[in-house]
């Protein structure tokens, strides 16, 4: 276990805690959105950022759990802590859009976005948008959320002169994926489902998303960094749906896992520490720059994933669940393929070369998949 305490170039190690890596940092005047902030490392990240003076918007699936976490954090921090709790179900694109609209109604700037929430399911499950659940929750939901909040971040960093930071929480588990890295067919048709591979694919997608986003932001000359972190092996509620894994983690946890306070350290370091200023498109572990798999640095795969994700976020707004779900499986798949091809043509015409340059949404009447679409005051409202 000596490696756990060995400090890297940053001066920190795997044994460092979130409070230690942010000691002396003044976050007053900053606003952060943290997904999955009601428990685990998300909650600890929210607590430590609030401790440093950051106003934290806790994006949570369970509002009651979020409210309890908020109360506990505020009771602990002397002088109070600025915390808001908003509902967000990352498996539903409609919920992501509602969250973005609710956040916009707060009229807050946005300096830091931490895409922390994740799920590891035991069974093969589709999201309400028809996507494999790991991919929908761990990647697509965060992809859409990031794009919907990005214009706010651009305005904030421009007006304040302070670098914006996007932190995507991935995992060393990204190495457990398909031979081709991302098997796009499995996202729409998860036959032969393997939960570990599905999870690994979604975590690989987190890194690829980060890298492509970083490239786009650099090309635009925007002062926003995007980095990925591996929090380490932690016995968190991520495994609550996997009884065997939970038992295993409880058995060997004291040997191989780290505490919640240590698990949140790398996220807090990348989100707040001055050492990370100007660093973007990197993968961090143990509060230091680390090396992900070769697939994770595949620029062409990152572009393919970006286009695929964009097409799915655009395509779902045309679907009425009440009618679509009643169609035969072959017709549903044909419809999705046609929609993907249409969106690909839009992309080729240059309308969607970046996360901000999208066409206006088409006129719609009635409902849509997973709920009603709420128009957002951003140029990217087509998402």
Describe the role of every protein-language-model region:
Residues 347-348, 356, 368, 373, ...:
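Low-complexity, intrinsically disordered or signal/transmembrane-proximal segments
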């Amino acid at each position: 276990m000596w490696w756990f305490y060995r400090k890297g170039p940053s001066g920190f190690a795997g044994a460092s805690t979130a409070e230690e890596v942010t000691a002396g940092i003044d976050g007053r005047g900053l606003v952060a959105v943290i997904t999955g902030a009601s428990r685990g490392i998300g909650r600890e990240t929210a607590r430590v950022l609030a401790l440093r003076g950051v106003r934290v918007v806790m994006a949570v699936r369970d509002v009651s759990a979020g409210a309890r976490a908020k109360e506990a954090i505020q009771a602990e921090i002397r002088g109070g802590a600025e915390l808001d709790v908003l509902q967000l179900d990352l498996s539903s694109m409609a919920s992501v859009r509602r969250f973005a609209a609710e956040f916009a109604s707060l009229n807050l700037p946005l300096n830091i976005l931490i895409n922390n929430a994740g799920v590891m399911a035991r069974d093969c499950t589709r999201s309400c948008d028809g996507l494999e659940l790991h991919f929908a929750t761990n990647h697509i939901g965060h992809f859409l959320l990031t794009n919907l909040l990005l214009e706010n971040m651009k305005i904030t960093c421009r007006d304040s002169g302070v670098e914006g930071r996007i932190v995507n929480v991935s995992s060393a588990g990204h190495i457990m994926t398909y031979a081709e890295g991302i098997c796009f067919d499995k996202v729409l048709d998860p036959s032969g489902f393997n939960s570990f591979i599905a999870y690994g694919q979604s975590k690989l997608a987190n890194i690829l998303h980060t890298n492509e986003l970083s490239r786009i932001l650099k090309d635009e000359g925007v002062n926003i960094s995007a980095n990925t972190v591996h929090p380490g092996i932690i016995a968190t509620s991520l495994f609550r749906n996997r009884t065997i894994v939970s038992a295993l983690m409880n058995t060997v946890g004291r040997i191989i896992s780290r505490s919640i306070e240590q698990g949140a350290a790398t996220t807090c370091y990348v989100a707040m520490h001055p050492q990370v200023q100007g660093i973007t498109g990197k993968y961090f572990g143990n509060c230091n720059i680390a090396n992900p798999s070769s697939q994770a640095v595949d620029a062409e795969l990152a572009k393919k994933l970006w286009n695929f994700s964009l097409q799915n976020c655009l395509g779902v707004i045309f679907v009425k669940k009440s009618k679509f779900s009643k169609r035969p499986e072959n017709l549903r798949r044909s419809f999705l393929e046609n929609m993907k091809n249409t969106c690909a043509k839009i992309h080729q015409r240059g309308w969607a070369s970046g996360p901000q340059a999208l066409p206006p949404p088409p006129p719609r009447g009635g409902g849509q998949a997973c709920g009603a679409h709420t128009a957002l005051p951003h140029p990217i409202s087509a998402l």
